[in-house]
């Protein structure tokens, strides 16, 4: 092992520790945050603090973006981890004197620092490892992060049983201190990362306003966040009614987060890739709103803690596994000049906007009905889930059109080995066929007409005798893809028709004039091309 490989191995080890600790701290922190807030305030105050947290988070993201334009992540993020660790100590000290204020401060603290630190950590990882080796290492780090989610839930539950909530705050501070040290030990980037000063938030909004596909992506993220806000309120409303003291709430939330962490990890590991390969991006994304709609109806009919646990658990499990992995693939068709400035806006700003809308809707419902029934909130979640399903249908169509257009124009390149979903595989095959068809037609026309003359009807009807096998196949492909009924029929009747041109016969099944003839010829080849027909 050379020195560079040894250094990378050490960096990876620290990254694995940091990822596990970071997500464990986040999950344990969420359990503590929820328990502390609900033990000091009625659940009807939850939308207010969520709105404040969303606004604070957006402000934090904008500030961090500005700082990262002048300070590298490896220098800035450890400092932010250290600051967060100190804030937990401050909240530990304040809790005995002002528990209400402390619970609000903790909520805002986690909202601002949570997204910033996770995003900053992945920026460090992306810069630290070279692109060639990054894919495999990132997969290992992501697995460590998933494991951290499970550990965090278990720790929150077990720690709450042996000590009070105040001591848990010191425990959370210690975890972020470990993150500060391990993240700093990951090391500096292996390559210089240029900062594009032309990329600004204003340009991102301009790009989104001019691209319908991006608008549908943003709309889906907003609706998913609204669903999450409604489902989370319904879940916590029932939980606060069943558990009265903060220690019981921490233990309950810790067990809940640990369970969804385990189930989400298993689902993504065992079925995530298979579902994408079998059903494509659209169907995979649709699983989340469909689950909310079904479980929401059950929750409306039977409003109990267990139905709300099922509803919230389904939402969390599918959001953190299938939805996230499939939604990330929606960026595939976008050229870099559109992807870079808009991804943060869609991923973060749209999510926070959804929090604001969802919490605003809850405040409106609470104004109308102060003793808001949980069933009403679940009904609203079902309605939003139905809207999300409609957006998924539109977005899937947009993805297909955008990817096909980008591939044909050559503005994006996709390595076939990197494709994990059925939708992209199908579009790549169609676009490759399109490019190959255009290339063949141009070559055939150039060979047949060196002086630029065009075919006449008499030329087309003439029998063409070519002894070269490749030339015969090329002419058959040219005829099959010409759009001319006479030439297509001539190709379908050619005795040289075989599996080598089957790919070009399949699209004819959608041609009303040629369906029967194409089907008749393909049935003789079907046993030899099962993969192309599925």
Explain the meaning of each model-derived region.
Residues 1-12, 16, 43, 47, ...:
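Intracellular loop-helix junctions on the cytosolic face of multi-pass helical membrane proteins
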Residues 457-467, 475-478, 486-497, 504-508, ...:
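Structural detector for internal amphipathic alpha-helices that build alpha-solenoid repeat scaffolds
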Residues 268, 428, 432-437, 469-473, ...:
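Alpha-helix initiation and capping sites
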Residues 72-76, 155-174, 255, 279-284, ...:
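A membrane-interface helix-boundary motif in multi-pass transporters
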Residues 11-64, 102-160, 198-207, 216, ...:
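Substrate-agnostic recognition of the 12-TM MFS/MFS-like secondary transporter fold
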Residues 82-100, 290-304:
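C-terminal ends and interior cores of transmembrane alpha-helices
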